[in-house]
């Protein structure tokens, strides 16, 4: 199972670095920061489906 450590999030701003991750909501997030901020916003219900685009 793919996992991402989001313990140091949320962050106020994310870089434009592009390393896509696919969330359990079937949405592609541009990088770990964007994904982790969304995880925090979802109260932990969002999980990582896999690395790369959905």
From Swiss-Prot:
GO molecular function, one term: serine-type endopeptidase inhibitor activity
Disulfide bonds: 6-36, 14-33, 22-54
Record's keyword terms, sorted: Disulfide bond, Glycoprotein, Protease inhibitor, Repeat, Secreted, Serine protease inhibitor
Site (Reactive bond 3): residue numbering on this chain: 16-17
InterPro entries linked: Kazal-type_SerProtInhib, Kazal_dom, Kazal_dom_sf, Prot_inh_Kazal-m
One annotated Gene Ontology cellular component of this protein: extracellular region
Domain Kazal-like: from-to ranges: 4-54
Location in or out of the cell: Secreted
Signal peptide (from-to): none
Residues linked to a glycan: 43
Pfam families: Kazal_1 (PF00050)
Keyword Amino-acid biosynthesis part of the UniProt annotation: no
Domain notes: Avian ovomucoid consists of three homologous, tandem Kazal family inhibitory domains.
Protein name, per record: Ovomucoid
Classification of source organism: Eukaryota, Metazoa, Chordata, Craniata, Vertebrata
């Amino acid at each position: 199972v793919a996992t991402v450590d989001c313990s140091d999030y949320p962050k106020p701003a994310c870089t434009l670095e592009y390393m896509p991750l696919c969330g359990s909501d079937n949405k592609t997030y541009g990088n770990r920061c964007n994904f982790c901020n969304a995880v925090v916003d979802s109260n932990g219900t969002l999980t990582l489906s896999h690395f790369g685009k959905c």
